[in-house]
């Protein structure tokens, strides 16, 4: 406004409810909708009869391939996952590490104020965060507890019923597989990271594709490698719009810092994620562009 924008260019609802959101989207004064949120909200935006740009959820894997520069890869993952307490939708939800460098990875990441839960603590963490323990009878009903979103690792641990050092940045949990049986391989929007071992390159890529297809279609996937051919194979296999190579996925996904992606916190997932856009949404998507077609005998 101080720079000359219209006085009412930014408005908001004090009343937080689906009814209020629906009423706003259907208001005759609204021309276009940019919807960022859960699948239900995005679907509602698309069905309200107006032009809508909806973006989807992410479930981002970081494949740590054996040829990577390991100290850099670990630093990138910690830097990315700890930023804003893991709230960015492009942040890593699981590190998938080749078996040849798994022990070295574990040793390196523990230098960064990262806490690995034991079996009992993992069950407590799953119960608090998702209401279900891995491989339990009700595991398919697991649903993220919204109270954990953006909370510090120390708070999450305390609420789950165990203690971590006061300077803990990230809570890590070793998981056996990707999918409903392991709730911590879901999107967590918090400084909690699943860690899985890959038997070989094909297994690492398979687990990464499973992560993306486990409620994160079209969003993002990261790989740390010095093998360009493996990077290409990974990119072709993952149904993700953004393939982030050798960079923190949070900052790689939202663009500008580590690559040439358009800077944005609104990340389209394309047809993979049932979105109308597949790019990083910016002002270009929200303006009308007039064109004059002057006669030219081509």
Regions found by a protein language model. Name each.
Residues 24-28, 69, 131-144, 184-186, ...:
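Short, surface-exposed amphipathic charged segments that create phosphate/polyanion-binding patches used
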Residues 162-298:
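Conserved C-terminal structural/oligomerization subdomain of aldehyde/semialdehyde dehydrogenase
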Residues 10, 33-34, 58, 98, ...:
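Buried hydrophobic positions in well-ordered alpha/beta secondary-structure cores of metabolic enzymes
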Residues 42-179:
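ALDH superfamily catalytic-core signature
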């Amino acid at each position: 406004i101080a720079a000359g924008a219209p006085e009412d260019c930014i408005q908001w609802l004090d009343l937080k409810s689906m009814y209020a959101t629906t009423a706003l989207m259907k208001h005759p004064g609204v021309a276009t909708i940019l919807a960022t949120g859960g699948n239900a909200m995005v679907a509602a935006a698309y069905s309200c009869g107006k032009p809508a740009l909806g973006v989807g959820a992410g479930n981002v894997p970081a494949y740590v391939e054996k040829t990577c520069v390991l100290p850099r890869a670990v630093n990138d993952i910690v830097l990315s996952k700890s930023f804003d307490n893991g709230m960015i939708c492009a942040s890593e939800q699981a590190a998938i590490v080749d078996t040849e460098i798994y022990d070295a990875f574990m040793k390196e990441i523990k230098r960064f104020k990262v806490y690995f839960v034991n079996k009992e603590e993992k069950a407590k963490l799953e119960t608090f965060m998702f209401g279900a323990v891995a491989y339990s009878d009700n595991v398919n009903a697991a649903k993220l507890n919204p109270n954990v979103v953006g909370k510090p690792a120390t708070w999450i641990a305390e609420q789950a019923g165990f203690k971590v050092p006061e300077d803990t940045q990230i809570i890590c949990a070793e998981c056996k597989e990707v999918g409903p049986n392991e709730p911590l391989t879901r999107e967590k929007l918090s400084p909690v990271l699943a860690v899985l071992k890959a038997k070989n390159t094909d297994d690492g890529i398979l687990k990464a594709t499973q992560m993306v297809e486990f409620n994160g279609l079209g969003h993002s996937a990261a790989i740390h490698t010095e093998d360009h051919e493996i990077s290409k194979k990974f990119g072709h296999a993952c149904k993700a719009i953004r393939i982030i190579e050798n960079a923190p996925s949070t900052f790689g996904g939202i663009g500008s810092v580590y690559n040439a992606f358009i800077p944005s916190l609104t990340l389209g997932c394309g047809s993979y994620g049932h979105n109308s856009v597949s790019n990083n949404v910016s002002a270009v998507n929200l303006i009308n562009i007039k064109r004059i077609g002057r006669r030219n005998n081509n």
